A protein has these predicted regions:
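Glycan-recognition and catalytic cores of secretory/periplasmic carbohydrate-active enzymes
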Residues: 1-298
Length: 298
C-alpha cells in the first residue's frame, strides 16, 4: 500500500480502503454462486499418509504440536474404524463419517496406516502402536496376498466378487498399496526381527524390477522402499527416562539433521512391556545410570 500510495500521491489508508471494498464486493459476488459439494468422510489410507507426515515432522522438527496431532488421528482411526471379517477376524473399515464406519478396507488402507502407526511409535515410543501396525500387515498377508504372482491384491478374499481382482503397483498422486506395504514390511522386519516380513517385501520387488529402469517415474515410492532396503538402514535403540534431559538430547540427535532409512525404538529402563515384541530393545541397559543410545546396521 505504501508504494502504491507514493506512486499515486494518496494516503496509504485510502489504498487499504479501496482494496478492502473491492475484496468485499468480490466475496459478495462469489457467494451468489452454487457452492461445490463437500465430502467430509475420513478415508483410512489418506489419513495414514497424513498421520505419518505429522509423526515424522514431530521427530525431525521436535514439535509436540505435530506429535499430538498424529496421536489424536491414530486414536480416532483405531477406535472408530475397526471391523470384523466374515471369519470373525479383526479387520478395518475404509471410511468414517457422522459416527459410522463402513466399506471393507482395501490393501492401501492397511499398508498406509501400518506405516503411519510405525511412525507414531517412533515419535512416542508408546508400545501399544506396534502390535496394531503388525496386525495391519498380517491381515493383508492372509487375505490380500497373491500366492501365484506375488504382491497384494487391492481387495481381500472376503470382498465382493469382481470379474478380476485388481493389483496396484504404480505410484501416482498417492503411493500404491504394494509400495506402502513393502516399506512397512521392511520397517517391521527391523523392529521385530521377523524374517517373514522381509521375505514378503522382497517378493513384492521381484516382479517389477525389469520395469523400474524403463519407467522409474511410475514407481517413485517403490524405488524409495528399495532404496531403504539396499541402503542397509540404521537401527537405533534409545534407553532412558523419557522426560530426562539426557534422553531428550539423544532423541534430538537421532532425528536431527534429517536422515532417512532408519528405524528407531525406545524404552524406559524398567518398561518390560515395551521390549516384548522389539528385539532391538532387548539387553540394552543404561550406561552408568544415564540414558544410552545403541546403533547398528546389518
Amino acid at each position: 500500500p505504501e508504494t502504491l500510495a507514493i506512486e499515486n500521491q494518496v494516503n496509504p489508508d485510502e489504498i487499504r480502503r479501496i482494496v478492502r471494498d473491492a475484496q468485499e464486493k468480490l466475496f459478495a459476488a462469489r457467494a451468489q454462486r452454487v457452492h461445490p459439494g463437500t465430502d467430509y468422510k475420513l478415508i483410512m489410507s489418506w489419513n495414514g499418509l497424513m498421520t505419518r507426515a505429522f509423526a515424522e515432522a514431530a521427530c525431525i522438527l521436535d514439535s509436540d504440536k505435530y506429535r499430538q496431532i498424529a496421536i489424536a488421528n491414530a486414536q480416532l482411526v483405531t477406535s472408530k474404524m475397526q471391523a470384523t471379517t466374515p471369519e470373525g477376524e479383526h479387520g478395518w473399515f475404509r471410511t468414517y463419517k457422522d459416527g459410522r464406519a463402513h466399506i471393507d478396507a482395501f490393501a492401501e488402507d492397511y499398508a498406509a496406516y501400518a506405516n503411519a502407526l510405525i511412525s507414531v511409535y517412533e515419535a512416542t515410543f508408546d508400545p501399544e502402536w506396534l502390535p496394531i501396525a503388525r496386525s495391519m500387515i498380517d491381515s493383508p498377508i492372509s487375505h490380500f496376498w497373491d500366492d501365484k504372482d506375488a504382491g497384494f491384491f487391492s481387495t481381500s478374499d472376503y470382498h465382493e466378487t469382481l470379474v478380476s481382482r485388481p493389483k496396484d503397483f504404480y505410484d501416482n498422486a498417492v503411493p500404491s498399496a504394494n509400495s506402502e506395504a513393502a516399506e512397512a514390511l521392511l520397517r517391521l522386519y527391523l523392529l521385530t526381527a521377523n524374517s517373514e516380513y522381509e521375505t514378503f517385501a522382497l517378493r513384492i520387488f521381484q516382479p517389477f524390477l525389469p520395469a523400474l529402469g524403463s519407467a522409474p517415474t511410475s514407481f517413485g515410492r517403490l524405488l524409495s522402499a528399495i532404496d531403504f532396503y539396499l541402503s542397509g538402514p540404521a537401527e537405533v535403540a534409545l534407553i532412558g527416562p523419557f522426560e530426562s534431559d539426557a534422553m531428550q538430547d539423544l532423541v534430538r540427535a537421532t532425528w536431527q539433521p534429517y536422515a532417512p532409512n532408519k528405524v528407531v525404538a525406545g524404552t524406559e529402563p524398567k518398561d518390560n512391556d515395551a521390549t516384548l515384541d522389539i528385539p532391538l530393545l532387548e539387553n540394552r541397559p543404561m550406561l552408568h545410570g544415564k540414558a544410552a543410545a545403541y546403533g547398528c546396521r546389518d
